[in-house]
Amino acid sequence: MALATRCKAPAAVCAAHSRRSVKVSAHKGAFEQVQVAAAAVAAAALLASPANAGVVLQQPELKKVFQDDAPAPAPVKREFKGLAPPSLPKPVEAPKPAAVAAAPEKKEEVKESGSDLDPRSIALPGALALTIGGFFAASKIDTSFNEWFIEAVVKDSNNYAGYEATLKTDAGVVFPKAATAGTKKVKAATGSKKGGFPFGGKK
């Protein structure tokens, strides 16, 4: 009996211990599940909410030192639409006359009484007639007027033009002597007295 009770007692203690451990492990498992669920809910909330940490991520812009920053102009497309007709100027409309225009006052023209002869048409013929008449009158009054007028108008050629220095001598004009030796030789060669060459066989 004692041995049986001794054997039963550890078995009961072992069963009680095993029950407690199962309960503790059950409590621990439930607590861990609650923690995992809370962590999952917190992670989901953090992932769903936007991150406002105050840090702005921006890529640095590289500057092109040797290139123009201005954008390249777009190519212009040229379309040939044919030759356009020449543009004619618009006709200018004449100003319309006023409906009631004041009649201009007529000025009385005063005609001067007198001859309608233009003095310029008489000036030239009168000057010519006066000059010729004066010349004839002076020649009739003074007989030496004609000589004086001719000497005044015509150049004196008694002293020549001034360039013929060899012709100016005290004795007057000196003409060169005619060379007769040549003509005599020609006459002797041809056999004619008058000189020249015989034509037609006559000597």
Curated annotation (Swiss-Prot):
Transit peptide: 1-53
Post-translational modification as stated in the protein's UniProt record: Phosphorylated.
Protein's UniProt name: Cytochrome b6-f complex subunit petO, chloroplastic
Region (Disordered): 79-118
Organism per entry: Volvox carteri (Green alga)
Family: Belongs to the petO family.
Organism classification: Eukaryota, Viridiplantae, Chlorophyta, core chlorophytes, Chlorophyceae
Stromal compartment residues: 142-203
GO cellular component: chloroplast thylakoid membrane
